[in-house]
Amino acid sequence: MGLFDMFKGDTEEMTPHFALAASLLFMMGADGEYDNEEVGQLLSVLGGEDNGSGSIGVGANNKALLDRAVKYVRKNTVDAFLAEAAPILTDAQKLCILVNAIDSSLSDGQAEKEEQVMLGKMLTAFGISEERFKPFFEVIVLKNDRSVFTNKNHPKNKDGYEVKLEVSKV
């Protein structure tokens, strides 16, 4: 521990709500850029309000949460975060984070390689297999595939095509 490390620490403990905010920031920044769609998705999860200047910012109730999460993400690695967060989360909270993380990743139309790696780290840290997560993933992929509206030749727009969800028995 260096002399000044005491000033770097996050004095508040990890909470599930904080883990949600931090996980979304880690996912958003995985590819080195914060896309507008990802910011919009973050605001939809954390809540937003008009700040009076014509732009929407994080609502007052969650501004402190987001500010704290931004500071945390700047100072900590995703591996350190996952080691700290995983033990305090319930199964439902882990899945909520994973679904929101993949939604953020796909909000701009595709999951970059770095975002795919990030999701893999989250799945592993949370003890959720790809097989178990697959149905959730498929729903979010469908939700974000807006090309079904703009491409009449999209394979899912063919006569007789029916969306099906495969649910594993894990």
Show where each model-derived region lies.
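Small-residue-enriched hydrophobic alpha-helices in membranes
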Residues: 1-29, 33-170
